[in-house]
Amino acid sequence: MKYQVVIGLEVHVQLLTNSKIFCGCSTRFGAEPNSQTCPVCLGMPGALPVLNKKVVEYAIRAGLATNCRIAPRSVFARKNYFYPDLPKGYQISQFELPICIDGHLDIEVEGGMKRIGITRIHMEEDAGKLVHADVPGVGDDSCVDLNRACTPLLEIVSEPDMRSADEAVAYLKKLHQIVVYLGISDGNMEEGSFRCDANVSVMPAGSDKFGTRTETKNVNSFKFVKQAIEYEIERQIEVIEEGGKIVQETRLFDPNTGSTRSMRGKEEAHDYRYFPDPDLVPLVIGNDWVEDARLSLPELPDAKRQRYTDELGLPVYDAEVLTATRELAGYFEACLALSPQPKPVANWVMGEVTRALNEENRSIADCPVTPPLLADLLRLIEKGTISGKIAKTVFDEMWRSGKAPEKIVEEKGLVQVSDTGAIEAIIDEVLAKEAGQVEEYRSGKDKLFGFFVGQVMRASKGKANPALVNEILLKKLNG
């Protein structure tokens, strides 16, 4: 029997605010356990939450960037459950009236586009963290770190529109790129700033009735999401074909085995006994607030890619690479403003700049070759002062020393030879030395032309103007 896979994702995005959602405690990652807490974080009696305005602004920006409608009125609700890392005994979230609804993202699937619906985006606080590893002085006991409690989150809930693990990863990558572009999250998956719950079910192909779903919690890498979904698909199909039934449950992914395991029975909404939080008034968002947020949005990746292909004439591949991060796109555009040659600038940014960054594991913000320096280098190539090959040598020296390209060219005597007389002399010397190869070329072995070009460039120590070398060499060989 053939099966249809149904996938929906719930993505938790930790927001890049300095303070928590309902108190003034720091959100800094990596602090000493329980050093960033207060009576609100700890759920002490009488401590009242105060909503962080920045969290609301970030939620609105996320909603606009994902084509959602911003609700004019939304309400915080208490999600009641017991867990050691939840000191209040409930989590402040949103239920019936979230801040953003009815959005979508378009993803590329097998050369075409597919629209993935977004049911809702809501604000909520994170729970604390249980540490199960051995702790000095504690032994094998589990410890609770409440630094993360009350940290602001957005939960972005998709429609069950994905039909493969690849589609789920494509959606997740696009969402990740958007929240990082917006500057509302650092997207650090290792630190838990961007994590995903994957809801997976299977049903007979052609059926319109969804199967029983399982939820795999807190998967924190694109690779693991793909593995978890693919494993869960295979597991569910195997259970069904052996005559069993899928249990609606919450599962955990084990990256060491690439498998999922049962964690607990899957709760329904009524199990959490949601009700409006009496300590927080309904949130009313006016049109002015929404429009201000809309005007503050940066150019998003899709629009930027389209502009690069339509207005700059760049290939689709180049546009995708250059818009991978907002910082890389900014570097490219800063170079382009100083040296308006889209394709050459793109080639250098995607080539030498990216290579050097990767070799030293640097970010583009830490690039020692600034846009003005790279633009100066490209101008030297354009004017014919140096060749493209020599330019790579100059770039490496710029990277190491931070010197201007003109100074490096002058100090090392790298100016390109464009004097026809000097180039002719070098060519004559090479042809005289390779008389046998010349005869073979003239007998029809045209491929030897590249050999002669290489010999001339070697004899000139790479300084000869390649265009002139080709032109003069062709005349002499065919003359």
Curated annotation (Swiss-Prot):
Q: What class of enzyme is it?
A: ligase
Question: Which is one Pfam family of this protein?
Answer: GatB_Yqey
KW Ligase (keyword) present = yes
Q: Which UniProt keywords apply?
A: ATP-binding, Ligase, Nucleotide-binding, Protein biosynthesis
EC number(s) for this protein? 6.3.5.-
Q: Which domain of life is it from?
A: Bacteria
Q: Which SMART domains match?
A: GatB_Yqey
Subunit structure comment from the entry: Heterotrimer of A, B and C subunits.
Q: Matching HAMAP family, A to Z? A: GatB
What does this chain do?
Allows the formation of correctly charged Asn-tRNA(Asn) or Gln-tRNA(Gln) through the transamidation of misacylated Asp-tRNA(Asn) or Glu-tRNA(Gln) in organisms which lack either or both of asparaginyl-tRNA or glutaminyl-tRNA synthetases. The reaction takes place in the presence of glutamine and ATP through an activated phospho-Asp-tRNA(Asn) or phospho-Glu-tRNA(Gln).
Instruction: List the protein's name.
Output: Aspartyl/glutamyl-tRNA(Asn/Gln) amidotransferase subunit B
Species of origin reads Geotalea uraniireducens (strain Rf4)
The gene for this chain is: gatB
